[in-house]
Amino acid sequence: MTLGVFHQVYTRPKATEEAIKSFRQFHPDNPYVLICDGGKSFHRISKRYNCLYVHEEDNLGYRDHTHSSGIYGMTKEEVLEWLRRFRLACTLCNTDHILMMEDDILIRGEIHVPEEWEFAGQAKPGNLLQEPFTDYLTEKYGVEWNVNYYGTGGGSIFNAKTFLENYERVIKIFDEEFDYIKENLCGNLGWVDVWMPMYYFLCGKQYRH
């Protein structure tokens, strides 16, 4: 099993460095893709910790319920761009699995991922995926759900090869269905801990935690 890292950052260099440092303590040579989300340059930190650095001009970010736009999370266009960046990281790392790192994640030991794991996050039975949403994907795309909740936030691990192999097919579904699902079936689809389970369930995979 080989493991790479996808880490999107913005304007918190001190937190970013602590997160990278914690990973490098146990995995000094693993490929690590650092993507700046339209913020300040992280080139110096990237060079110091042997990361592959990509600077994107557009900031994706998130919006909470209080945002003046009325948008919750990300829009379809922003999610598609996020997935493009994730695909880039998977391609650059060229590993079996990829860790979705965030600034508030600290690694406390060497990471060993079972080869059969497809996507793994937190066990959060309280984060229910509503039946109209799950039923819709089951009836239209044959999705089989081994859990009815979501939880793939920072620190989650994904099978990178599965992501790449299914990208063109699943991206087409996201492009066609995202707005309808977000507006009618799953209002929090604009958050990564929801859209990534949707992606992998559309690949026919099971959630681990």
Locate predicted features.
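Short beta-strand-to-loop acidic/aromatic patch adjacent to the donor-nucleotide binding site
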Residues: T95-L106
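Short, acidic, metal-binding catalytic loop of nucleotide-sugar glycosyltransferases
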Residues: K21-N30
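Conserved glycosyltransferase catalytic-site signature
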Residues: V79-F86, D103-I105, L189-P197
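Catalytic donor-sugar/metal-binding loop of nucleotide-sugar-dependent glycosyltransferases
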Residues: P197-H209
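Active-site-proximal specificity loops/subdomain of glycosyltransferases
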Residues: I35-C93
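N-proximal low-complexity "stem/linker" segments adjacent to membrane-targeting elements
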Residues: M1-K21
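Short, charged/polar "capping" segments at the starts of alpha-helices
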Residues: K14-T16, G39-I45, L129
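Conserved catalytic core of nucleotide-sugar-dependent glycosyltransferases
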Residues: I107-N184, L189, P197
